[in-house]
């Protein structure tokens, strides 16, 4: 639950390091694997004093997932996450948004018997815009270190922070990338088609995960669907979804799914 008043929002709602307005339509709830999609307890402020511009900043409760062992534990976090974004809109269905996040991730080492922190960061650009009267484009790109918690495909891998094989008793934040691009074609005011391709990628650093060849390296996502807005309060659709996962040993698996 959350509450908004005088451009302030407090409570549990969608996070500041994402762009709901640039997400393509999918029946799949999470959406593209390279998109950022999450909720957080937060205090945020939105400034709308400039025509066509919107600026937002938030302080969010941190959620850190890491690859731990008998040597490491994720500690109670000492700092919130900080996000900021700026958005320019040139009509009701077209905008460009840039944003960023910075976070401090705390862990404890059983060898050192003390808490340490790793700094993570992320940058993001997203857009949606008209291409004539029938087409709508969507896109987003995200890059950073230690932002796995926010990327759809990587959020379940516990890789916000991981052990550093080259520094005994230390953990590190790995680089990661996520992006998507999609198109929507409006057949009529009530019926539209859309298709999106997306990718998320985890990069190796300081020898991790050289000894874990089955670790996720990158994933790909393709979706195509059709929607019919039967009434203002009722929408039906059908969707084909295909996903691929490739590990650091280059083994690849895939799956297909139909959604209604």
At which residue positions do the language-model features occur?
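Repeated loop/turn-to-beta-strand initiation elements of outer-membrane beta-barrel proteins
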Residues: 6-10, 51-57, 93-98, 134-137, ...
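Hydrophobic, lipid-facing positions within transmembrane beta-strands of outer-membrane proteins
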Residues: 1, 39-43, 80-84, 121-125, ...
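Surface-exposed loop and membrane-interface regions of Gram-negative outer-membrane beta-barrel proteins
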Residues: 1-5, 18-31, 68-70, 106-115, ...
């Amino acid at each position: 639950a959350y509450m908004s008043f005088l451009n302030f929002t407090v409570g549990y709602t969608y996070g500041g390091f994402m762009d709901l307005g640039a997400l393509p339509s999918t029946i799949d709830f999470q959406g593209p694997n390279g998109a950022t999609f999450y909720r957080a307890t937060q205090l945020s402020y939105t400034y709308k004093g400039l025509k066509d511009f919107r600026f937002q900043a938030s302080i969010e409760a941190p959620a850190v997932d890491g690859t731990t062992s008998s040597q490491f534990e994720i500690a109670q976090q000492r700092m919130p996450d900080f996000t900021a974004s700026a958005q320019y809109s040139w009509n009701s269905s077209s905008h460009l948004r840039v944003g960023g996040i910075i976070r401090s991730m705390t862990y404890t080492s059983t060898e050192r018997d003390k808490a340490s922190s790793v700094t993570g960061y992320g940058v993001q650009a997203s857009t949606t815009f008209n291409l004539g009267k029938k087409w709508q484009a969507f896109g987003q790109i995200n890059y950073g270190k230690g932002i796995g918690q926010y990327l759809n495909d990587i959020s379940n891998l516990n890789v916000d922070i991981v052990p550093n094989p080259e520094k005994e008793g230390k953990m590190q934040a790995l680089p990661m990338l996520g992006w998507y691009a999609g198109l929507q074609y409006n057949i009529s005011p009530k019926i539209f088609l859309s298709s999106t391709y997306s990718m998320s990628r985890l990069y190796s650093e300081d020898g991790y995960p050289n000894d874990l060849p089955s670790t996720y390296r990158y994933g790909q996502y393709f979706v195509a669907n059709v929607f019919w807005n039967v009434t203002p309060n009722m929408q039906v659709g059908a969707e084909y979804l295909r996903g691929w996962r490739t590990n650091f040993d280059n083994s690849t698996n895939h799956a297909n799914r139909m959604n209604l």
